[in-house]
C-alpha cells in the first residue's frame, strides 16, 4: 500500500487534529503517502483532496476541531453517491482509508468496504464515548472537562442565589458525559438515557436535599434522558419545587477547545495504530484502546453492540449526593 486517504466525518471532537497528525507522520515513517479528504463523505464525492506531508500537520496537535473540516452528506446515503465517492478515490490512487469519527462515519465506511472492497480502518472520534470496542473515544475527556468547568462556575451562582440548576449536556442516546460530569461535579441528580427518569422521584430527591439544609442543587441531564431535555424535566416538576430553578444548556461548547493531554495521547496512539493496521492488511475494523492496550474491533460490532455506562458509578453518585 503506497497511498492512503484520511478524513473526518460527523460531529467534530477535540483531538481529531492530533489523530490526523499521527496518521500522516506514521504513514511517512512507513513510506506511505497520505491524501487528506476535506469535508468528510461530501468532499469525497466532490473530490476535495489534498496531499498531506509532515509539515502540513505541524502545530495542530493542540487545536480543537478538524483541519480537514467535516460535513454531513445525504448523497452518500445512496448507492449512486457511494459509487461516485469510490470513483474519486480510485482516480486519486487511494488504496485504503483511515476514517475518523463516530457511528455514522463507520456505517458509511462499512458500505465502502462491503460494496466496493475499499480497505478502511476506523478511529473513534466522538465526544459521546458510545462506541463499543474502546474504553474511551477521542474527544470525550475534553468534553467532560469543558462541561465540568462550566458546572463548577454555575454551582457558584446557584449557591449565591439559592437556586436549583438543571444543566443539559450532550448525549442523545448515551449518558457517559452526564455521568462523569455529574459525579465529578457533585450533582444531586444525574439523568441519563440508559435509565428511566421519573420526574416525581427527581422532585423527591431535591425536596429531601432541601430538608437536609441544602439551599442549592445541580441536576445534570443528558439531552436524550427526558423528552425536551433539561427544560422538559424542569417543566414536569417545577410545581413541586420550593426554590427557584433555572435551565442551562451547555450545547456545542462541549465540542470545542484545545484537547486535553489524555485526548492528545489517545488520538496519537490510535491514529498511528490505524495506519499500521491498514498497511498490514486490516480492513473493516476500528482501532480502540481497551485496558491500556490497542485492540481491533469489527466496525459492524463497534456500531451495533451497545456500550453501557458504569452503573456502579451512577449508584455511587446517588449515595454521595447527600
Swiss-Prot record:
GO terms under cellular component: 6-phosphofructokinase complex
What HAMAP family does the database record attribute to this sequence?
Answer: Phosphofructokinase_I_B1
Which gene name does the record give? pfkA
Q: Which family does it belong to?
A: Belongs to the phosphofructokinase type A (PFKA) family. ATP-dependent PFK group I subfamily. Prokaryotic clade 'B1' sub-subfamily.
Tell me the domain of life.
Answer: Bacteria
Record-listed ATP binding positions: 11, 72-73, 102-105
Q: What is its EC number?
A: 2.7.1.11
Q: Which residues bind substrate?
A: 126-128, 163, 170-172, 223, 246, 252-255
Keyword annotations: Allosteric enzyme, ATP-binding, Cytoplasm, Glycolysis, Kinase, Magnesium, Metal-binding, Nucleotide-binding, Transferase
Q: How is its activity regulated?
A: Allosterically activated by ADP and other diphosphonucleosides. Allosterically inhibited by phosphoenolpyruvate which induces the dissociation of the active tetramer into an inactive two-subunit forms.
Iron: is it a keyword of this entry? no
- What organism, scientifically named, is this protein from? Thermus thermophilus (strain ATCC 27634 / DSM 579 / HB8)
Residues bound to ADP are 21-25, 155, 186-188, 212, 214-216
Q: How does it assemble?
A: Homotetramer.
Q: Which named protein is this?
A: ATP-dependent 6-phosphofructokinase 1
Q: Which InterPro entries match?
A: ATP_PFK, ATP_PFK_prok-type, PFKA_ATP_prok, Phosphofructokinase_CS, Phosphofructokinase_dom, PKF_sf
* Subcellular location, principal: cytoplasm
Specify the taxonomic lineage: Bacteria, Thermotogati, Deinococcota, Deinococci, Thermales
The UniProt entry, under PANTHER family, shows: ATP-DEPENDENT 6-PHOSPHOFRUCTOKINASE, PHOSPHOFRUCTOKINASE
